[in-house]
From Swiss-Prot:
Single GO biological process annotation from the record: selenocysteine biosynthetic process
Gene: selD
Organism (species): Salmonella typhi
Assembly, per entry: Homodimer.
GO molecular function: ATP binding; magnesium ion binding; selenide, water dikinase activity
Broad enzyme group: transferase
Residues where ATP binds: K20, T48, R49, D50, D68, D91, G139, H140, S141
Annotated site residues (Important for catalytic activity) in this chain: K20
UniProt-recorded name of the protein: Selenide, water dikinase
Cofactor binding, per record: Binds 1 Mg(2+) ion per monomer.
Family per similarity comment: Belongs to the selenophosphate synthase 1 family. Class I subfamily.
Reaction equation(s) it catalyzes: hydrogenselenide + ATP + H2O = selenophosphate + AMP + phosphate + 2 H(+)
Length: 347
């Protein structure tokens, strides 16, 4: 089979971050008394489902460690590798850090797909690493029934600048650096519903580095930060709210969306991960239409940064975003938690 005829997405049952195990099932897997390990230098572990682990070296610098890998979300091998690597590196930026090194994770059906295609995937990953200014320094590979690619990434951050997903405050404005709808558009493409003018839009967004995260971390008024990936905006925002004991009020019209996303939702281009996310987080939502629900629960692959920002730092955040070519609009705010109100409400 020629490389041009290969459709990588046909060789896997899941796609991108949409193939994550659902939060409900993951809770069952991770629930263990042995998971509790006390180390005063471990600043961020698994307790708040943050983007990466952070370890204090005791000299003013902390190490960030993360891993992320998934099955193809696009058919082009190079783009698949680039997206997977960009997505993995994003976790370092989401913690406010700077990546310093990556190693590759590759699972490949060697009797089904040519090693040449795997090389293209790896080259895409290497390209993303070069964009981030780091080496793809090694890795590990296995013969697997479905193609899988990703990275384990190491980063560094000044300890006082670590940005967690659990330290937001009531009164903070919420900002999102990329539009939602990646899961919808990639599903529309798999179903041959995607219009010519929307071809490549999702890939362009997924390949966009969240490098601004390290700059946002230098702003004192950025109280919390995370990236929006497989659990959708609802899932990652809920984790931010739960960790800080606050509630979120979102303005649907202000949430950035990829062109055509509402039309494709109406046509049924909704990935399976959306329903899994709703099953895990839907009870935290206020009343909303199926269309709104489908967007907020849409699994993002290499999605944007979600920031909780104090009002006095809003101008600094917008100016920093502009330096990186990001146009920011507040999508909502955090308020004091009150009983009888949903954790995430839409207006």
């Amino acid at each position: 089979m020629s490389k041009q005829a290969i459709r990588l997405t046909q060789y896997s049952h899941g796609a991108g971050c949409g193939c994550k195990i659902s939060p409900k099932v993951l809770e069952t897997i991770l629930h263990s008394e042995q998971a509790k390990f006390v180390d005063p230098n471990l600043l961020v572990g698994n307790e708040t489902r943050d983007d990466a682990a952070v370890y204090d070296l005791g000299n003013g610098t902390s190490i960030i460690s993360t891993t992320d890998f998934f099955m193809p979300i696009v058919d082009n091998p190079f783009d698949f590798g680039r997206i997977a690597a960009t997505n993995a590196i994003s976790d370092i930026f989401a913690m406010g850090g700077k990546p310093i090194m990556a190693i590759a994770i590759l699972g490949w059906p060697i009797n089904t797909l040519s090693p040449d295609i795997a090389r293209e995937v790896t080259e895409g990953g290497r390209f993303a690493c070069r964009q981030a200014g780091i080496a793809l320094a090694g890795g590990h590979s296995i013969d697997a029934p479905e193609p899988i690619f990703g990275l384990a990434v190491t980063g560094v951050v000044p300890t006082e600048r670590v940005k967690k997903n659990s330290t937001a405050q009531a009164g903070c404005k919420l900002f999102l650096t990329k539009p939602l709808g990646i899961g919808v558009l990639t599903t529309a493409e798999k179903k041959s519903l995607l219009k010519p003018e929307h071809q490549g839009l999702a890939t362009e967004v997924m390949c966009r580095m969240n490098v601004a995260g390290a700059a946002f971390a230098n702003i004192d008024g950025v109280k919390a930060m995370t990236d929006v990936t497989g659990f959708g905006l609802l899932g990652h925002l809920s984790e931010m709210c739960q960790g800080a004991g606050v509630q979120a009020m979102l303005c649907y019209q202000d949430i950035p969306k990829l062109p055509g996303v509402e039309e494709y939702i109406a046509l049924g281009a909704v990935p399976g991960g959306t329903e899994r996310n709703f099953a895990s987080y839907g009870h935290l939502m206020g009343d909303m239409s199926r269309e709104v629900r489908s967007l907020l629960c849409d699994p993002q692959t290499s999605g944007g940064l979600l920031l909780a920002v104090t009002p006095d730092a809003e101008d600094d955040v917008k100016a920093t975003a502009a330096e990186f070519g990001i146009e920011l609009t507040a999508i909502g705010e955090l308020v004091e938690a009150r009983g009888g109100r949903a954790m995430v409400e839409i207006r």
